[in-house]
């Protein structure tokens, strides 16, 4: 008869550190054709800004060339950029929304 071997049970814990997702700034860029009221509408509709917040961001866009609408994980930022650009084109405005790593 064979000899019964020792069975050793090894339990290994693997601890992985969950990294927070990379964050991205959603940016509206200035142009010479999109009305200021439309920019305010976009900020309220897509970024849930109050009229005062939207006006402040719109003025930053107008004077500084661009303004930050919000900071989001990549997937959300990418979706918001696509939605804003599509909405602008549907309304025949050249407003450009883009994203930058935060």
Swiss-Prot record:
Gene3D superfamilies: 3.30.1390.10
InterPro entries xref list: ClpS (IPR022935), ClpS_core (IPR003769), Ribosomal_bL12_C/ClpS-like (IPR014719)
Transmembrane segments: none
Gene Ontology BP annotations: protein catabolic process; proteolysis
Domain of life: Bacteria
Family affiliation: Belongs to the ClpS family.
Described purpose of this protein according to its UniProt entry: Involved in the modulation of the specificity of the ClpAP-mediated ATP-dependent protein degradation.
HAMAP family in the cross-refs: ClpS (MF_00302)
PANTHER family: ATP-DEPENDENT CLP PROTEASE ADAPTER PROTEIN CLPS, ATP-DEPENDENT CLP PROTEASE ADAPTER PROTEIN CLPS1, CHLOROPLASTIC
Subunit and partners: Binds to the N-terminal domain of the chaperone ClpA.
Name under which the protein is recorded: ATP-dependent Clp protease adapter protein ClpS
Naturally occurring in which organism (per UniProt): Shewanella woodyi (strain ATCC 51908 / MS32)
């Amino acid at each position: 008869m064979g000899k019964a071997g020792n069975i050793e049970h090894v339990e290994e814990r693997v601890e992985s550190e969950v990294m927070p997702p990379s964050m991205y700034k959603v940016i509206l860029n200035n142009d010479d054709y999109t009305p200021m009221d439309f920019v305010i509408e976009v900020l309220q509709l897509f970024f849930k800004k109050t009229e005062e917040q939207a006006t402040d961001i719109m003025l930053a866009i107008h004077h500084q060339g661009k303004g930050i609408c919000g900071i989001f994980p990549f997937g959300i930022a990418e979706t918001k950029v696509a939605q804003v650009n599509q909405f602008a084109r549907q309304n025949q405005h050249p407003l450009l929304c883009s994203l930058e790593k935060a």
